[in-house]
Amino acid sequence: TVAGKPVLRKHLTIVLTSDHGGSGTGHADATVREHYRVPFLTWGDGVDAEDLYALNPTYKKPRRKRPGYGAARQPVRNGDVANLALSLLGLRAIPGSTIGTDQDLVLTADAGG
């Protein structure tokens, strides 16, 4: 396992998420949490064992709501994954992307990513 290999563990960050669920024949009902609530987990050397929203106060924890894309403060979204991964690799955001382009999602209280 990764945990048993110190050299690998020191250079690896895992970012895990999934697609949202659905029920019946759709998945757009904003009143059904399973239509929009998904896991977004990170693990690795330098990743704090902390809630992403505690580390990223500029993001809005949605709680039981589903904020629209036009809201002033956004929740962490699946769309943040690609630009977070690129940031971890020291690369710029995907050209033309609209989510996470500032690459300001941090995984540590040091804000060093």
Predicted regions and their residues:
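Membrane-interface soluble catalytic domains
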Residues: 1-11, 20-113
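Generic enzyme active-site microenvironment
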Residues: 15-17
